[in-house]
Structures are given as C-alpha cells and as structure tokens.
Amino acid sequence: ATEDLTVVTTMMESRHLAGDTGLIEALAVIINPSAMWPPNDFIRGKLSEQQNRHDRYSNTEYALEPNIKSSPGGLRDLQVIEWITLRCFGNGLSDVNEPDFLSETERDQLRNGQEFLSQVRFALHNMTGRADDRLLFDHQKKLAALWGMVDGDTLAVEQFMQVYYRWMKT
C-alpha cells in the first residue's frame, strides 16, 4: 500500500465515523509524510497523474463535449489541489491558511468553481439517471435551460458553455 500513490491518497482522506478513535489515530501515524510519500514525492506523483489525465482528455472530442470530472480544469484537478494541501499542510483546502500557497481570493475562486462544477455534475447525473460525467451536446442544451438561460444574441447552450469554460479555467 505504501508504494501505491492511489492507495496512500485514499488513506489520507480517511476519517473517523464511528467506533474506536484509536484506529484512525494509528492510521494517521502510519501515513504521515515522514513515514511514506514525503510531500515533494507526493506532489510530483500527483502532478504526473494529472498530466497523464490531461493528455488523455485534451483532444478535440473532449474540448467540445468535456468530462466534468476528468477534463483539464475539472473536478479531479480541484481534488489534486485538495490532496496536495492535505499532504503538505495536514488540512484540506478550506482550512489551510498559507498565503504563500494560495491567497484567500484564489481559495474562494477554487471553492466557487468546485461548487459550480459539482452542481453541473449532480444535475447531469440526475438528468441522465446515471453517473455520466460527459457533457454531450444534448446534455448541454438541457443544462442551459435548467440554469435558466434562453436564446438571445447568443444561444443558451453557448451561454452555458461559456460559463462552464470560465470555471474550468479557474
């Protein structure tokens, strides 16, 4: 498990829900940065995973019908930032007070972007009746209507996707 970055990341996100608190405390000792995956190695590993994912989802097909979770700027990128802050500072993004890492404005932008993308993802899952993260053309039109956008000088679907891409660039 200590060799696998995905397993380490999953263990980092563990939290006490019920039962013996000593177990979660013991896990925290085992997975602390000095015990395995020091922060610099962890960051390099996560950025390598991110680059591989970006390479996979950066083609034209995904530019026009992006994957909310995996396309560049999507929810997985926000999760990478969350994991890095957790690994380096011991706190999640919302609890980190490190101005040299992120300003309050940047943290707010990330939080707002995550909220928007999560809402779009939830709406898409609800609309399709399954865990589908791809914004296909038909879905884009329905989501634009759901967000209250109407055709004008710019089509509603274009308005929606402009908002979507602005958040993806955040």
What spans do the regions from the language model cover?
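A nucleotide- and high-energy phosphate-metabolite-utilizing enzyme signature
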Residues: 1-170
